[in-house]
Amino acid sequence: MHKLRAIAAAAIGLAAVVIPVAAGSAHSNRAANDHGGHQIKHVLLISVDGIHQSDLEWYISQHPGSELAKLVHKGAEFSNARTSDPSDSDPGGTALMTGGDPRATGVYYDVEYNHDVFPPGTTTCTGPAPGGNAIYDSPDDKLPAVPDFLHPNPSDPNFQTFPSFDEGGSIFPGGNDTNPGLIMGLSPHPQSGLNTATFPVDPSTCKPIMPWDYLKVNTIFQVIHSAGMRTAWSDKHAVYTSFNGPGSGGASIDDFFGPEIDSQAVEPNGTPYPTDTDWAHDDAATKQYDGYKVQAVINELNGFDHSGTQQVGTPAVLGMNFQAVSVAEKVDSPSTLTKNADGTYTESPTELAGYLPGTTTPGPLLSSALDYVNAQLERMVDTIQHDGLAKSTAIIITAKHGQSPQNPLLLKRIPDGPIISAVNAAWTAKTGDTNPLIVAGTDDDLWQSYLSVKTQDAANFVKNYLWTHPATAQLYNNDGVDRGTESVAHSGLAQIYAGHDAAAFFGVPYSDPRYPDVF
């Protein structure tokens, strides 16, 4: 019997709960190696993306008989766990699968840059690698631009495109999704839906670096698979097959289920959602989307593959991420989809996302999302109990990341495009170099920039510009109250690390090619 140690990691102030399902006598002070006499053979890992420790505490206080309350009271709760830094779906997901932070894994974001690779699409690798984008996200799909089902004419002012729900057209030819339930038949190895021409190119082989080979350390799936046990995972992009780990050939996750969340949201009857958006910008749609992954997990707990058609045995490690809470924290949208007698569907009215203004109390939309997650966890636990797996299964509930700020009145939105353009223009004026200084980066609730000139002087230039220039922020107005704009100092930033300081912050050598030059 292989002894396995379950490690839960979560964001600052997030919930991390480890529960041996049948251990009714479990206490939070139980020794780490004490499983109450039960031999754990299966671990169900659940990431409730976006959930905070305060959300968990609030929900349990309001719903003391809920499944979340039962699991917390029967398990060990870690209330001061920390996420990766930076914190987002990735590197947060990679942290859960490896136990590593970006220093160890080499993954800083799903959209980043590497100074030691050739740009995507390079076929002739001569001379030193100039650096290039390292993007492992939905643009990597083979069908990245399916025309809008509601507005398919490019001349329509509302025309837009989405990646295909099945990534590469394996279920829906041309990405024409008229029956989203068919997604359950998605391949357990969806790598064929990835467009390798979008990946950075390895200078030593002049070949694209596959997502799993970009990781610098192995993953839990590699360990378990190598030990002869079955593995499964469900997530929002096929590119998250990166969790297979380096050198795996993408084969250490036996059953990966990754419907593309950035595809156009379609109601169960094949009608596009009236909000005309993707699965991540309408919480009613997000719940439908999460439901496919929940069904995949239940099928796997029942001993089948994610489609429920092949009997393969219950995986030793399996799980999924929930998106409903994360979306309900940040996107004003309907919360429910109701089926009508004639087979059509009706969405509820749009509700405000996040928390009640001035508080960290979940508003109705977020409360509904927490209810949804709780109900799906109850389904999973019921399945575990019904299948006789309770004495041999542990559940880990955690989060890849949180969402900030919780109090919506603290939210200040600052467009980054004008700032980047101004930095590049100032650099040209100073040096005469007409090439953009900032060539890549991600600016979310943080700022990270990669520079075309990797010197301390260039990094200091960006830092000094950001610190000495104000920016205009749009204040929270989702509730209909026009609070106007506000001039914020230091480009809206609180702390800036540049060059050697950025390397020291992440704990890597200055010569490391992956960390952001300015953070």
Report the location of each language-model feature.
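Signal peptide processing junction and immediate N-terminal pro/mature segment
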Residues: 21-31
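His/Asp/Glu-rich, glycine-adjacent segments
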Residues: 100-101, 105-345, 474, 486
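Metal-dependent active-site segment of extracytoplasmic phospho-/sulfohydrolases and closely related
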Residues: 371-414
